[in-house]
C-alpha cells in the first residue's frame, strides 16, 4: 500500500481526531487509497464503507483482502439492505418497501465506529433515508466521512443531488446519530490518473479555472474535427495503430452520449473493428451495467454513465461538439457550463485522450462552454489539433423554427422504463404493488446460463438470446412453422442494398429448418445482430451448446403446462411477437393524443411502438428468462395494457411468466390507474425536475 499523500493524510488525521469529514475529491485523486489507508491507520475502529457502484465495491473488497485489513466492510446501498433487511433489496423497489413499511432488521446490525459514504454526489433521497434508517436501527452514534465529486453527479434526472455532498455538514448538523458535531472540509485535488496535458485541457479549455492538479506528463490531447465518415475511419485506424504498438483491447474505451441508433457512428466503428477480429463489447441498452467478465479483454463502447468509476489507458470521446446539447442534453438551460457527463468522459484515460468533433454540416460547431477555440488549440502545447480550424459558425435556424412545430416523441415500453426519476418511482410504486398478484409461486428453477465462455476465452452475455430462442422454439412447435426465420427475413427487408454485407451473407447461409436449440440460439443471435446492426456477438460466439436438451425439454414442458391451457380446442389463437401499435400509424394514436393532451404542451405528441411476446384468445403474455420478475418487467406490461385499452381492443388478461422459475404474475387494473402511471413516466422523462431551493432541501433532508 502506497504512503498517503499530504491531502489524503489530512483527511485521515482529522478522522483520527474524532471529527466528521466532508471531502470533495476530483477524478482519479485516490479516494479508494484514502479509504484503505484510513482502515490501516485506525485498526481499533470498525469501519463501514457504503458506495454507489458495485464494481467499485468488488475492487475495494479485493484490495481489503490483499492488504489483510480486518476492520472494514464494503457495501453498496443494495448489498447492505439485502444483508440486513430483505433479499428483495437488490433493487431500489426493495429498499423503497423497507422504508415504507419501516421493516425491522432480520439480524443484529454489527456496531460500527466510522461510516464512509462514498460517491455521495449521486445520493438520492431514497438512499439518504435508507442510510438514516440503517444507522438508527444500529442504535449507536458514529463518525462519518462523506466523499465525492460534485462534478461527477450524473443522475440528477433520477433524483440524485450533489448537495448531499456539498451541504453535508448542514444536513447532519445536530444529528443524534453522530458522536461529534464537528465537521471538517477537506479536498483531494491531485489526480493520479490523468496526465498533465489532460489536466490542462480540463482546467483551461473546459472550465477556465484550476480545478485539478496533475503529476505525470504524457502526450497532448488529440482533438480531431472532421466529417462523420472520416471520424469513423480515423478512430478505427488509430485504434489499430494502438493495438499494433502493443496496447491491449481491454485498455481502450470508446465513449459517447449514446450507443443506440441504427446509424450511429459508434456502431459503424464497432462493426469495422469486429470485421477485423478485434474483440469488442457494446451494451444492448445505454443503461446496461458493464459486467466485468463480459468486458474483459475487449474494446468497450459505452455511455459516459456506464463508464463512471472506471478508467482505461486510452479513451475516445465521440461527439465532443455542440450536437451533444441538441441531441442528448436538450433540457440543459445553460450550454455555457461544462456538463458533468463530458467531465467524466474526459477524465477516464490514464495515457491518451482523443476528442472527436463532427464537421459535417455548416451548423456543426464546437461546444459552447469551451474557453478555447480551434486556433487556441493549435497554439497550445497540450493539444494536437487535426482538421480544418474555424472561428465563425452558422446558427441552426432550422432547428429554432422546428421548436414551434409539432414535437413528436417516439417511444416504446423498453425506452420508457429507463432512467426513471426517484420521485416518479415513489409515486407509482404503491400503485404497481396493488396492480400485481402472484398467481403461481416460484417452483423448481431451471438452470439456464446467462453468461457463457467462448473458445477464444472471452465471456458473452446470452440472456437476450435465451429469451428469444426458447419461446420461438415453443411457438414453432405450436404452429409448425419457423417464426424466427421469418422475423429474420422481414428484418432484412429494411437494409439498403450496399450495407451490412456480412449479415446478408450469414442470412444467406442459414438453414431454413431449425432442428435443435443450437439452431434457434444461432438464429436468435442473427436476429439480434440484424435488429441492432451490431456484429460483435455473432462474430465472437463460436458455439451454441450452453442449453442442454434436458433443459430445453423442461422449459417447453413448463410453457405447455401454463400457456398450453389457453390453447385447447380447434384453431386456437396464438400470435407470437405480435405488433399491437406502430409509431407510423397515425389513426392508432387518435385516442392516445386525446388522453395525453391535458398533461403536456400543445405541440408535443407521442408515437408508440410495441410488440408483445405472445397473444392468445384470453391473455397477453410477457415471457422472461431471468432470475426474478422485476419492476421493469411489470412496467412493460402496464404500458402494453394501457396501449391495448387506448386502442379499444377486447379485454384480455395481462400476465408475466418467468420461464426459469415458473413464477406467474397477473395484473388486475382500472384504466385510470394505467393512465396515471404512463403520464408519470412520460413527465419524468420530458419535464425538467424542479430542484428544491437550498432552504427547502435542508428542510426536507435532515439527519436530525
Please tell me what each predicted stretch does.
Residues 4-7, 17-46, 51-59, 78-80, ...:
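Conserved helicase motor core of SF1/SF2 NTP-dependent helicases
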Residues 51-53, 58-59, 64-98:
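Inter-Walker segment of RecA-like/P-loop motor cores
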Residues 612-627, 640:
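Conserved catalytic cores of phosphodiester-cleaving nucleases, focusing on short active-site segments
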Residues 309, 564, 591-592, 599-604, ...:
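Metal-dependent nuclease catalytic regions and adjoining charged, substrate-binding loops involved
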Residues 339-353, 631-660:
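Metal-dependent nuclease catalytic cores in nucleic-acid-processing enzymes
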Amino acid at each position: 500500500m502506497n504512503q498517503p499523500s499530504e491531502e489524503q493524510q489530512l483527511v485521515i488525521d482529522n478522522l483520527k481526531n474524532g471529527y466528521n469529514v466532508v471531502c470533495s475529491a476530483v477524478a482519479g485523486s485516490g479516494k479508494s487509497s484514502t479509504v484503505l489507508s484510513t482502515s490501516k491507520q485506525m485498526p481499533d475502529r470498525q469501519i463501514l464503507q457504503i458506495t454507489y457502484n458495485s464494481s467499485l465495491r468488488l475492487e475495494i473488497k479485493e484490495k481489503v483482502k490483499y492488504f489483510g485489513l480486518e476492520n472494514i466492510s464494503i457495501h453498496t446501498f443494495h448489498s447492505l439492505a439485502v444483508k440486513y433487511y430483505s433479499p428483495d433489496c437488490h433493487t431500489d423497489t426493495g429498499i423503497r418497501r423497507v422504508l415504507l413499511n419501516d421493516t425491522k432488521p432480520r439480524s443484529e446490525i454489527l456496531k460500527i465506529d466510522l461510516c464512509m459514504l462514498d460517491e455521495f454526489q449521486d445520493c438520492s433521497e431514497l438512499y439518504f433515508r435508507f442510510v438514516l434508517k440503517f444507522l438508527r436501527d444500529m442504535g449507536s452514534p458514529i463518525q462519518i466521512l462523506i466523499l465525492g465529486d460534485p462534478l461527477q453527479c450524473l443522475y440528477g434526472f433520477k433524483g440524485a443531488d450533489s448537495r448531499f455532498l456539498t451541504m453535508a455538514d448542514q444536513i447532519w448538523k445536530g444529528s443524534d446519530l453522530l458522536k461529534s458535531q464537528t465537521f471538517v472540509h477537506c479536498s483531494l485535488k491531485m489526480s493520479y490518473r490523468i496526465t498533465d496535458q489532460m489536466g490542462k485541457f480540463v482546467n483551461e479549455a473546459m472550465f477556465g479555472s484550476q480545478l485539478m492538479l496533475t503529476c505525470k506528463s504524457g502526450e497532448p490531447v488529440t482533438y480531431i474535427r472532421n466529417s462523420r465518415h472520416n471520424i469513423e475511419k480515423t478512430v478505427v485506424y488509430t485504434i489499430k495503430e494502438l493495438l499494433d504498438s502493443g496496447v491491449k483491447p481491454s485498455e481502450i474505451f470508446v465513449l459517447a452520449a449514446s450507443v443506440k441508433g441504427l446509424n450511429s457512428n459508434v456502431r459503424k466503428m464497432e462493426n469495422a473493428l469486429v470485421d477485423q477480429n478485434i474483440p469488442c463489447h457494446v451494451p444492448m441498452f445505454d443503461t446496461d451495467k458493464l459486467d466485468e467478465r463480459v468486458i474483459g479483454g475487449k474494446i468497450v463502447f459505452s455511455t459516459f454513465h456506464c463508464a463512471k468509476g472506471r478508467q482505461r489507458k486510452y479513451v475516445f470521446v465521440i461527439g465532443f461538439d455542440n450536437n451533444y446539447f441538441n441531441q442528448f442534453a436538450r433540457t440543459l438551460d445553460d450550454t455555457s457550463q461544462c456538463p458533468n457527463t463530458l467531465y467524466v468522459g474526459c477524465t477516464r484515460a490514464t495515457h491518451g485522450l482523443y476528442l472527436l468533433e463532427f464537421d459535417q454540416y455548416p451548423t456543426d460547431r464546437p461546444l459552447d462552454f469551451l474557453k478555447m477555440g480551434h486556433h487556441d488549440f493549435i497554439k497550445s502545447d497540450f493539444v494536437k489539433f487535426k482538421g480544418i480550424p474555424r472561428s465563425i459558425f452558422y446558427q441552426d435556424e432550422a432547428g429554432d423554427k422546428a421548436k414551434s412545430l409539432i414535437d413528436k416523441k417516439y417511444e416504446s415500453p423498453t425506452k420508457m422504463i429507463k432512467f426513471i426519476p426517484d420521485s416518479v418511482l415513489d409515486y407509482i410504486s404503491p400503485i404497481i404493488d396493488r396492480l400485481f398478484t402472484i398467481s403461481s409461486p416460484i417452483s423448481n428453477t431451471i438452470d439456464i446460463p446467462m453468461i457463457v465462455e467462448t473458445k477464444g476465452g472471452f465471456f458473452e452475455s446470452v440472456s437476450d438470446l435465451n429469451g428469444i430462442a426458447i419461446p420461438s422454439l415453443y411457438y414453432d412447435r405450436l404452429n409448425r412453422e419457423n417464426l424466427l426465420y421469418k422475423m429474420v427475413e422481414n428484418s432484412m427487408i429494411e437494409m439498403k442494398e450496399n450495407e451490412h454485407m456480412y449479415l446478408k451473407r450469414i442470412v444467406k447461409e442459414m438453414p431454413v429448418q431449425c432442428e435443435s436449440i443450437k439452431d434457434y440460439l444461432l438464429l436468435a443471435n442473427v436476429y439480434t445482430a440484424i435488429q441492432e446492426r451490431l456484429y460483435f456477438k455473432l462474430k465472437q460466439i463460436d458455439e451454441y451448446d450452453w442449453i442442454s436438451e434436458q433443459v430445453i425439454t423442461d422449459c417447453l414442458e413448463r410453457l405447455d403446462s401454463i400457456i398450453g391451457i389457453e390453447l385447447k380446442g380447434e384453431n386456437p389463437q396464438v400470435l407470437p411477437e405480435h405488433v399491437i401499435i406502430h409509431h407510423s400509424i397515425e389513426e392508432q394514436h387518435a385516442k392516445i393524443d386525446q388522453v395525453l393532451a391535458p398533461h403536456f404542451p400543445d405541440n408535443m405528441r407521442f408515437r408508440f411502438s410495441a410488440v408483445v411476446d405472445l397473444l392468445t384468445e384470453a391473455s397477453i403474455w410477457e415471457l422472461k428468462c431471468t432470475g426474478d420478475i422485476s419492476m421493469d418487467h411489470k412496467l412493460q406490461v402496464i404500458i402494453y395494457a394501457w396501449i391495448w385499452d387506448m386502442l379499444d381492443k377486447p379485454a384480455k388478461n395481462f400476465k408475466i411468466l418467468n420461464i426459469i422459475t415458473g413464477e406467474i404474475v397477473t395484473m388486475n387494473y382500472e384504466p385510470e390507474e394505467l393512465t396515471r402511471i404512463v403520464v408519470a413516466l412520460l413527465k419524468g422523462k420530458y419535464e425538467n425536475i424542479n430542484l428544491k431551493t437550498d432552504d427547502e432541501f435542508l428542510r426536507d433532508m435532515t439527519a436530525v
